[in-house]
Structures are given as structure tokens and as C-alpha cells.
Amino acid sequence: MKIDLIISADDIKEEKVKNKTAVVIDMLRATSVITTALNNGCKRVVPVLTVEEALKKVKEYGKDAILGGERKGLKIEGFDFSNSPMEYTEDVVKGKTLIMTTTNGTRAIKGSETARDILIGSVLNGEAVAEKIVELNNDVVIVNAGTYGEFSIDDFICSGYIINCVMDRMKKLELTDAATTAQYVYKTNEDIKGFVKYAKHYKRIMELGLKKDFEYCCKKDIVKLVPQYTNGEIL
């Protein structure tokens, strides 16, 4: 098995993801939201690229659909919820369809559509994602959403954590230089919360008063679910 890594949604190329197992990571905060919502009983998450498409989809899915997402970290006008995992509690999401659009994460998911399997990864479910990777037994590309098309420390160290979890389960692995570096960064900085504080994205999260979101998104393996994207929906 070979593991590769893409550093941002802007860097996705079809030949890099086609027929592989793609693991999409937007640790702060889209993939953490998706994982949390589904773990709390959300029926499905439908990722879309634009606000206009989200408004159209919510009509298609009817009364059990809710709108969530952000632009530049802020809740979108007219939406039910922002991109805070703390908002997606069981009483809010159980049995609902979440229509979601975000600045970085949903672009990374949609950009990975030629992959054989698309898994949604985060620190919250890193061990479970690693188990699924081993089960699928296919070459892997970890797709970092990044931040506005740029490299993001948070997604990178989360990738390293998941790669490390796979390495604990499989000895015969081939890592690209990017994947090797991510795993090394994690192994030398296993306190993810402490290391992510160096990230530009962290500063933005703090500016928005989202410390609780940050602390939650850094919790390792509190979710055993591995969301999978197929035919336009994440289940």
C-alpha cells in the first residue's frame, strides 16, 4: 500500500486521486462537523460548493433538511447553523439531512470524486479511519483541504496522525515524501493541540472566539464512525 498526501484543495489533480482511497481532512472544522453530525444521528450530509446550490438542495430534500456552513469562518446569512461542531447536537441533527458548504472542506470533498472510496477524516476519528484504510487495502491519498488554497498546519498534523495509526497496523507501507514528513511532524509533536497553535488558521479561529471548537476538534478518537462520501452524499 502506498500513501500520498495533497496539501490543499487547490492542489488536487485527477491522476493523484483516481481509483484510490481518498481521505479528506479539514480538521478546523468541516470534517470534524461532518463526523460529529453523523455520529449524533444525522441521516446524511450533502456537501455542495456554493451557497446557491445549498439553497436549491435544501428545497429538494424537503422539511427534514437543514443548512450549515461558513464563509471566511462565519455563519452564512439565512443558514440554520455555522461550521461549529458544537452546534450539531443530537437534538438538532437526528434524522435530518445536512446541506453543507464551506470555504475549504467541501471543495476538497468534491474535488476527490474520482477516488474509489472517499473517507472523511479528523482527529476525532483517526484510529477508525486507519482501520478502514487497512480494510479497503488500496493505495491512499490524504487530501488536506488547506486554508484558502494554501498549506495548513492543522490538516497536515492530522494527516500525520492518521498515517501513524495506519503504520501501527501495517508494516509494509510506501510513503511519499509528503506523507513521510506529515508522519514525522506528528511523531515529534503528539500533542496536536499544542502544535496547531502555530497555525495561521488557529489565529483566525481564536479571533472568531471559537476556542471551544478548537479544543473539541483536537480530541483524539472520541468517534468510532468513518463517514463515506458516495453519489453526492456522506453517510
Curated annotation (Swiss-Prot):
Record has Transport as a keyword: no
Coiled coil spans: none
Catalytic reactions on record: (2R)-O-phospho-3-sulfolactate + H2O = (2R)-3-sulfolactate + phosphate
Gene3D superfamilies cross-referenced by the UniProt entry: ComB-like (3.90.1560.10)
Swiss-Prot/TrEMBL keywords: Hydrolase, Magnesium
Cofactor(s) required for function per UniProt: Mg(2+)
EC number in record: 3.1.3.71
Short name of one Pfam family: 2-ph_phosp
Gene Ontology molecular-function annotations: 2-phosphosulfolactate phosphatase activity; magnesium ion binding; sulfopyruvate decarboxylase activity
Keyword field contains Hydrolase: yes
Family to which the UniProt record says this protein belongs: Belongs to the ComB family.
NCBIfam families (UniProt xref): PRK00886.1-4
Name used for this protein in its record: Probable 2-phosphosulfolactate phosphatase
Organism of provenance: Clostridium acetobutylicum (strain ATCC 824 / DSM 792 / JCM 1419 / IAM 19013 / LMG 5710 / NBRC 13948 / NRRL B-527 / VKM B-1787 / 2291 / W)
